[in-house]
Amino acid sequence: MSVPVQHPMYIDGQFVTWRGDAWIDVVNPATEAVISRIPDGQAEDARKAIDAAERAQPEWEALPAIERASWLRKISAGIRERASEISALIVEEGGKIQQLAEVEVAFTADYIDYMAEWARRYEGEIIQSDRPGENILLFKRALGVTTGILPWNFPFFLIARKMAPALLTGNTIVIKPSEFTPNNAIAFAKIVDEIGLPRGVFNLVLGRGETGGQELA
């Protein structure tokens, strides 16, 4: 019998080997077979990811929006290259039919491209003041570090739904997928790593909501 793969987290631009003893089994809902294991991540793991995102954020925000958008397009291209692999993961761990999984992957790539197009529309405003001869200039600033705690039902698309607007507008992010459907998120992190996204901009922690998720919240 083959041993299920044990997945690492992705923090500060690298896959981090889990030093703890507790693992969570990821189960195929159709066969009830254990298909992988993920770390039972704790609050300190989430805090490390938040700290990495915080360190990376000022330099990321300093990039022009159009340059941040170019990174998003690299991610969407990577998704399209690995679409078959990712859709198979969604079917295996989430129990979706193949067609629905394929649509989710394609829509995810399209959504990231859509958000990248907003780089040319991400502008400030000039507002007329209540006083004569005066205008108000409005500059948009990033919030800083954002987090995304994901459900299991549309696991892959919701990574993009949280990440793409955050990164485009100069924020960094920490994502925690559902412990029931984490394998597709690992595939997403591999794409981020392969394209060389600046370290700390995207982080992935694994575990349960009441531990790592609580820290992110």
Regions found by a protein language model. Name each.
Residues M1-I38, S70, K74, G124-T147:
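Terminal low-complexity tails and localization/encapsulation signals of metabolic enzymes
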Residues G124-A217:
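Rossmann-like NAD(P) dinucleotide-binding subdomain of oxidoreductase/dehydrogenase enzymes
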Residues R19, A46, A83, A101, ...:
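Alpha-helix N-cap/helix-start motif
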Residues Y10-I11, D25-N28, V34-R47, G196-V201, ...:
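Histidine- and aromatic-rich ligand-binding microenvironments
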Residues D25, R37, L89, L100, ...:
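Conserved beta-strand positions that form and line the central face of beta-propeller blades
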Residues A33-Y122, G133:
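Glycine-rich loop-to-alpha-helix module at the N-terminal edge of alpha/beta enzyme cores
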Residues V5-H7, I11-D12, A22-W23, V34, ...:
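Glycine-rich, flexible loop/turn motifs
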